[in-house]
């Protein structure tokens, strides 16, 4: 019984990419989506569609990056990096209302150990442990089934990237003005997306 529970689950590359991409783009962007809801009223069908297109764009961007990384066997390290950074940034955004940007990362590097320990709370360790470390371990633990044909694998990944690019272009064609206005008037939103970090 225990042996069966500890057996590594296996997925094909496509399923693994979709699962990792979904977690990073949707689950680790909750802080971003909450901030968008504060400035984008869902009082019309158009605004609802604009809001619903945001996870699609985030999903497509992360999917492109992870799929490109899979050509060099970097999909797992990239996914782990995105998961850990996204979980940490989301925790700080939701807990302290701060946005992690490039200057904040510079400040983190300059932080003394005493300052770092002052920020560590049981809530932080639990949140980062579950949404970051555990999720990264699971992403690495899942066994990716080898593909039967190299050509088929390359074609699949190319199609995966193409579909993601087409989704981004479709959203841009339909909602470019809305995105431009929203992000121009609310610059802090750009920095709170996990794919910006």
Role assignments for model-derived ranges:
Residues 2-190:
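Transmembrane and membrane-interface helices of multi-pass
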């Amino acid at each position: 019984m225990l042996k069966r529970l500890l057996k590594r689950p296996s997925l094909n590359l496509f399923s693994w990419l979709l699962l990792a991409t979904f977690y990073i783009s949707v689950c680790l962007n909750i802080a971003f989506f909450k901030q968008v809801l504060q400035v984008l009223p869902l009082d019309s069908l158009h605004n609802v569609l604009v809001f619903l297109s945001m996870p699609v764009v985030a999903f497509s961007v992360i999917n492109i990056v992870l799929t490109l990384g899979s050509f060099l066997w970097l999909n797992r390290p990239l996914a782990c990096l995105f998961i850990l950074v996204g979980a940490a940034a989301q925790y700080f955004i939701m807990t302290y209302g701060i946005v992690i940007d490039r200057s904040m990362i510079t400040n983190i590097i300059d932080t003394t150990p005493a300052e770092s320990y002052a920020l560590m709370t049981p809530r932080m360790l639990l949140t980062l442990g579950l949404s970051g470390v555990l999720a990264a371990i699971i992403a690495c633990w899942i066994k990716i089934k080898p593909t039967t044909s190299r050509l088929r694998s390359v074609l699949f990944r190319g199609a995966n990237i193409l579909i993601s690019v087409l989704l981004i272009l479709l959203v841009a064609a339909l909602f470019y003005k809305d995105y431009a206005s929203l992000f121009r008037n609310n610059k802090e939103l750009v920095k709170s997306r996990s794919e910006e970090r």
